[in-house]
Design a protein with these regions (language model features):
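Active-site-proximal beta-strand/loop segments in catalytic clefts of secreted hydrolases
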Residues: 85, 179, 213-215, 244-246, ...
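Histidine- and aromatic-rich segments of cupredoxin/plastocyanin-like copper-binding domains
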Residues: 145, 154-157, 204, 210-334, ...
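Histidine- and aromatic-enriched segments that form or immediately flank copper-ligand environments
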Residues: 6-27, 83-196, 201, 250-281, ...
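Structural beta-strand segments of beta-rich domains
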Residues: 78, 117-121, 237-241, 391-393
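Extended terminal and domain-junction accessory segments
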Residues: 2-81, 190-212, 271-402, 447-453, ...
Length: 492
């Protein structure tokens, strides 16, 4: 009897093991991405509560290709040329680093334009083997100019070029970076600052400077300096620091020696910013804060992550004051003066979506492990939020993981309505790159007024490359571009 039971148990175990192996093999096979594919192929359309059939339809008579959603023609007021290349760059310390660069520098050249100007940028690829594009981070431009390989264009191969054109319609601090193999190419140096100034600059006497934070080859940088960048600013001068986090992780910035105001977030001005003293500013990966103050008679020090890397301002440009101690964290949800909002929690929304960020065991492109999920799905079987032009859209973002996720929506700015169920009580807070901490929930809203197929992804670009990527698609918009090895397009 025992032998019979043992034999039966052995058969059952063998059957279970065979079934498990068969299931694992099937799951592995199903997870593998095709050699080439369209971002429209595998995503799960989510209509956000709108009637069925309101979403994207392939081949419909009203279909519009992303190649037709381009910037204005005509004579540009500003022309720039960006040349991407492999090479070495010399840091302020004298150390040389092998990097990718635009125009031979890391960061690439600072581009400054005026509101209303037609801007033309010609990208040339000298020898970046994997190809390159330029994405204009935070600029709500036409979809065909967005610079995402495999969605809005093909990556530019070595020896090739591509022209971007857009009207500078927003005033504020933005940046540009590669969106082909971005987890690698941005980290290795393909990025730079873009500043859109008012059509009429109110006061040319302002000391207006970019402070771009990055980690290059393991070395923290402020602009091109791997130490303290020193600048001369005379007492009494109005100062505006444009803080840009081009890194993959949040960056904590402390300013000592003066009170200051946070006057803009992600390129949008705040209402009624008040003076802050000893406040730590945490910048989302990809995010921007504009800080303003009047230069005091004594030096001012900006420190990144409480390290020796930073910016020192003084009358003679030679001082290096002590590193400021961290203070309480700045909270944009309660900062500034409340002001009328175009929509709020009580508004009628045409589309209402939930975006739940999670992790689970599974396969991603044939690789086993603990994978990022969006609404329970592993890329590419993740939601695609479908909208119509003119829709008022609301999204609830929940982070159920133990990591922070700076969620970046291309082509739009989101109005932050609430955090963890508590309404924003300060200034209107518009964001294109929202830092969603572990366990947090944000409710955001935007008007769907910019047709296209737009990425919505984590701007920890390593997370995005590992599948934390989805898209928002307007009904009737199509793309002829494909992603994958044969297409040579790899947006993340």
């Amino acid at each position: 009897m025992r032998r019979v039971l043992a034999a039966g148990l052995g058969v059952s175990v063998a059957v279970l093991a065979t079934s498990l192996l068969a299931w694992l093999g099937w799951a592995w096979y199903q997870s593998r991405l095709p050699e080439t594919y369209s971002v429209m192929d595998f995503a799960i359309p989510d209509q956000g509560g709108a009637p069925p059939g309101a979403g994207h339809t392939h081949g419909a008579a009203r279909a519009t290709s992303v190649v037709d959603l381009r910037g204005p023609r005509g004579t540009p007021q500003r022309r720039f040329w960006l040349t991407a290349a492999n090479g070495t760059v010399r840091l302020a310390s004298g150390r040389t680093v092998h990097a990718l660069s635009f125009n031979g520098t890391v960061p690439g050249p600072e581009l400054r334009v005026r509101e209303g100007e037609l801007v033309e940028v010609t990208l040339r690829n000298t020898d970046v083997a994997g190809g390159v594009t330029v994405h204009w981070h935070g600029v709500d431009l036409p979809n065909g100019e967005d610079g995402v390989a495999g969605v809005t264009q093909d990556a530019v191969p070595p020896g090739g070029s591509h022209v971007y054109r857009f009207r500078a319609g927003q005033v504020g601090t933005f940046w540009y970076h590669a969106h082909q193999a971005s987890a690698t190419e941005v980290r290795r140096g393909l990025y730079g600052a873009l500043v859109i100034e008012p059509a009429i600059v109110p006061d040319a006497r302002v000391a207006d400077m970019v402070v771009a934070v990055h980690t290059l080859d393991g070395t923290p940088l402020v602009n091109a300096t791997d130490g303290v960048e020193r600048r001369a600013v005379q007492p009494g001068t109005a100062v505006r620091l444009r803080l840009i986090n081009t890194d993959n992780a949040p960056q904590r910035v402390d300013i000592g020696g003066t009170p200051f105001r946070v006057v803009a977030i992600d390129g949008t001005d705040l209402t009624g910013p008040t003076l802050l003293r000893r406040r730590t500013l945490e910048l989302a990966a990809g995010g921007r804060y504009d800080v303003a103050f009047t230069m005091p008679p004594t030096p001012v020090k900006l420190a990144v992550e409480n390290t020796l890397v930073g910016l020192a301002l003084s009358a003679d440009g030679n001082s290096d004051p002590s590193t400021p101690a961290p203070g309480p964290e700045f909270d944009p949800a309660v900062y500034g003066r409340p002001s009328p909002k175009p929509f709020d929690a009580s508004s009628h929304y045409d589309r209402v979506f939930s975006l739940d960020i999670g992790r689970k065991l599974g396969f991603f492109d044939g690789h086993p492990g603990k994978q990022w999920t969006l609404n329970g799905g592993i890329y590419p079987r993740v939601p695609m939020f479908m909208v119509e032009r003119g829709d008022l859209v609301r999204i609830s973002i929940r982070n159920g993981t133990g990591a922070v996720h700076p969620m970046h929506l291309h082509g739009h700015h989101m109005l932050v309505l609430s955090r963890n169920g508590v309404p924003v009580s300060g200034s209107r807070w518009w964001s294109d790159t929202l830092n969603v901490e572990a366990g947090e929930r944000y409710d955001v809203a935007f008007r769907a007024d910019n047709p296209g197929i737009w990425m919505d992804h984590c701007h920890n670009l390593r997370h995005a490359a590992d599948g934390l990527t989805m898209h928002i698609a307007y009904a009737g918009v199509t793309t002829p571009f494909e992603t994958g090895g044969a297409a040579h397009n790899h947006p993340e």
